[in-house]
């Protein structure tokens, strides 16, 4: 394997773009903190961090395999390894299988409940790329998939999925729909041309209102989570800071343009970090 092929595999796994990994990792780590009522055991941190990174790469590979014919028509994606012919579909499938096995080995160190949930997580990861063909809001499926680690974190530590896990899960789904709609704005013109479905296409001229609506719902659910868990004022201060980030992002993505939309999308990882920090503060 030469240097060019290694670079192609690196690009296929999107390791040069860590922001989506962080968007998955922060809610998962936050769930570990909530489930542990404090800092979790280091073994959980290692297992779930590896799991997030590996499954994110698996999702990217599945997405590129599913979209290889569509990506040829989109300026932002027509240089991807599969689309440009740097790697074959067979190469991608073998890499995907290998990484999935790595993730499964990690989950074997957890309890049976979590092992069973891992199959649901894999199903969602496979389902999402194909939803763009028939489901009007594939961002909803992405939200289910990206944040499923929340359920797995609670099941691993508590062997159950309590009410607070559901509240937090739904909050992060709303958040994901909002930030991935921003991301989809960058490709909306191409999606309309080739018939790909997305929330950015569905919401049309009201897309900015819907993004703000889902941001608001995520904040509201975080407040409900804080009340349910009897969190202190630092938690609500963090929610206020998150709302300011949402407002800042609004003025960025409202300008449209690929760069503005991608930058607004990327900034959301700071919101995930803030929520993680204020969760940790609750148990110090």
UniProtKB/Swiss-Prot annotation:
GO terms for cellular component: plasma membrane. One of its GO terms (molecular function) is 4-hydroxybenzoate polyprenyltransferase activity. Pathway: Cofactor biosynthesis; ubiquinone biosynthesis. Its cofactor is Mg(2+). Its main location: membrane. GO terms for biological process: ubiquinone biosynthetic process. Belongs to the UbiA prenyltransferase family. This is 4-hydroxybenzoate octaprenyltransferase. It comes from Francisella tularensis subsp. holarctica (strain LVS). The gene is ubiA.
